[in-house]
Amino acid sequence: LVSGCADLTALAAR
């Protein structure tokens, strides 16, 4: 889950 969360955050940060 953490991995998915980080991935989403990176996408949102973009």
UniProtKB/Swiss-Prot annotation:
Could you give the cofactor binding note from the entry? Binds 2 calcium ions per subunit.
* Gene Ontology terms: biological process: hydrogen peroxide catabolic process
Keywords, in A-Z order:
Calcium, Heme, Hydrogen peroxide, Iron, Metal-binding, Oxidoreductase, Peroxidase
State the reactions this protein catalyses. 2 a phenolic donor + H2O2 = 2 a phenolic radical donor + 2 H2O
Its needed co-factors are:
Ca(2+); heme b
| EC id | 1.11.1.7
Q: Does the keyword Calcium apply?
A: yes
Gene Ontology molecular function = lactoperoxidase activity; metal ion binding
Q: Where on the tree of life does the source sit, at the highest rank?
A: Eukaryota
What is its biological role?
Removal of H(2)O(2), oxidation of toxic reductants, biosynthesis and degradation of lignin, suberization, auxin catabolism, response to environmental stresses such as wounding, pathogen attack and oxidative stress. These functions might be dependent on each isozyme/isoform in each plant tissue.
Q: Which family does it belong to?
A: Belongs to the peroxidase family. Classical plant (class III) peroxidase subfamily.
Could you tell me what this protein is called?
Peroxidase 6
